[in-house]
Amino acid sequence: PVVDLVEKSGCIEVKTDKSAVISQDVVLATNAYIDALPKSIHHGINRKILPVESFIIATEPLDQATADSVINNGMSVCDNNILLDYYRLSADNRLLFGSDSSSEKDMVQIMRRNMLHVFPQLENVKIDYGWAGPIDMTMNASPHFGRISPHIYFAQGYSGHGVALTGLAGRIIAEAILGNDERLRIFEGLKVPSFYGGKYLKNLATKIGVLYYKFLDRYR
């Protein structure tokens, strides 16, 4: 793993435990895992994001009639809740269903309950897989792209829209590295509030926030 970045004569020395690499430019694209980096690398941009767990289950392959009763146009779908449900069919007609769960221990059972609330016709369908992983959220859901220095770039804060935004981020940063930073400067102008208090306060804020948004989704 990288343990430090040192700027030297217009280049960046990327240090590891065993060696070092000299690079003209460096892009930090660690997203929800940025807290694992030393501050000498991230320079405090970790305060702009909050890691939040995302949970997904996958059903067994559905017969075509059942699949069509769920989604019949091949689209990916999400609802308008704050803690939203999102789902699509895979190439082999599995329903991939993502939603909120507050406990990884019983995540599959909670997710199945959420799925059946939307698609009760799947009552007798087996769940083959379930998994979880962190995504990086900003306080106002704006993406956070920019520069720490003239040769150190970063892209984070996709807030659940990484499939669409990561390609855009890569192109915009590549343009800037090649000398055209017009589009990057637009994103650098976005106001992205900071989260303060370190890792433990972030974890507490996440738990409180989930409960608060669940309340809003239920009663608004």
Spans of features found by a protein language model:
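C-terminal catalytic lobe of FAD-dependent flavoproteins
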Residues: 97, 105-218
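Active-site substrate-recognition segment that forms the wall
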Residues: 4-10, 19-150
